[in-house]
């Protein structure tokens, strides 16, 4: 329900009589009256988008997208490529006022630093807390907010968590060893979720909950976090679902969602400490996310306003930093183990770099390894963490794509346009043999030319703010794990790695491995044995 020029506006039109029993004003949250024949005819035939090809049901109702995203579990964006081919058009209609564009030059325009394409309000406000980074629509406001938080995610701050990363790797090693000795398969994706959760918490809050230290490395909170992401599309269509989660009374929340309630309590403690520090004017140690929240709205009138729901925003940061990085780490492990030549070349590079991986751990040198970098970029291309739609509004004056004109539309039927990362990473005019895992494409002159198409962290002013931490984890974890352990895939293949689009990608089954040996331990025994023989 939205405020229109003639009163309240709902899915089927203006409402000027709030006393009417059928008024949208009196309908419960989440209610959506099925579109009438008149509305369907208007949507399908009379709107300016009527000439854009696409499924007829998609033109009539947004519930067509609901069916493919919610009921069929994230299948809609996977169908766009075949729809573009079916209708032989770079633009297809995917909703009553929404289109998808498969055109690399348009993608570059939409995600440029000077883009005029603003975020689509309903999608992003459903996912982000009010006033939070994900839901800020105005570019100027977003830039101010991002600049305010930038020090927290800057390279210098990320460098400060390297000691924690080394500690996390040592804890992970114990879990690897346990599975090696028992010869039990290891769910490495679950382990990586705990690892990345700890690292994000260390950066955001200045302390880690030690999720990875929980026995098998899969803390109940991290498991709950994984389950929560399964409902991402449901939250987009019914935003109140997420609100319920964060506004349950503690007594009821402890019964229905104890892990989230524990996190909520901890966040409220951090928030209270931050307010106390701001009021006292005494800042001890590194500022955390809640310290930055406390400063919002405290400056001049031009300053960024505060976040209405800081706990929810903190949860969004944690979810984004956990799931996407863990998915990329797991996909990297799969691609390395599934491609013997890649495995061989990577081992050669890692073995030549043992001085700063094993002997004197140096994150900067690890992040400069060329072939490892190419492997990670190719993983982010072929297994991109956010493959689907990031919807935007067509700017004033409209835009022409090929021979198709897209009008800006009028409220509330503004034209929504998207150009998915999937359409870029599988484009055979950009990437030769796009479905093949070829790290070499990112090396040499070809690699320099492809850099503008490295979209793993998106592009433009809305690019992932946490990319520095993600890169640190991707490089250092992959280098350490594959330098130290011999392993093989267990019940993991191309079919289990097929993904669904839950805003972020989710493979059908977690990546599992068998730990075959500890190479460093074998080398230590070999050296010790050689020394003993010499003494004899």
Curated annotation (Swiss-Prot):
Gene3D superfamilies: Cytochrome P450. Pathway: Alkaloid biosynthesis. It is an enzyme of class 1 (oxidoreductase). It comes from the Eukaryota. Keywords: Heme, Iron, Metal-binding, Monooxygenase, Oxidoreductase. InterPro entries: Cyt_P450 (IPR001128), Cyt_P450_CS (IPR017972), Cyt_P450_E_grp-I (IPR002401), Cyt_P450_sf (IPR036396), Cytochrome_P450_monoxygenase (IPR050121). Its cofactor is heme. Its EC number is 1.-.-.-. Heme binds at residue 464. Transmembrane segments: none annotated. The keyword Metal-binding applies. GO terms for biological process: mycotoxin biosynthetic process. GO terms for molecular function: heme binding; iron ion binding; monooxygenase activity; oxidoreductase activity, acting on paired donors, with incorporation or reduction of molecular oxygen. Cytochrome P450 monooxygenase; part of the gene cluster that mediates the biosynthesis of paraherquamide, a fungal indole alkaloid that belongs to a family of natural products containing a characteristic bicyclo[2.2.2]diazaoctane core. The first steps in the biosynthesis of paraherquamide is the production of the beta-methyl-proline precursor from L-isoleucine. They require oxidation of a terminally hydroxylated L-isoleucine to the corresponding aldehyde by enzymes which have still to be identified. PANTHER family: CYTOCHROME P450 (PTHR24305), CYTOCHROME P450 12A4, MITOCHONDRIAL-RELATED (PTHR24305:SF166). Belongs to the cytochrome P450 family. This is Cytochrome P450 monooxygenase phqM. It comes from Penicillium fellutanum. The gene is phqM.
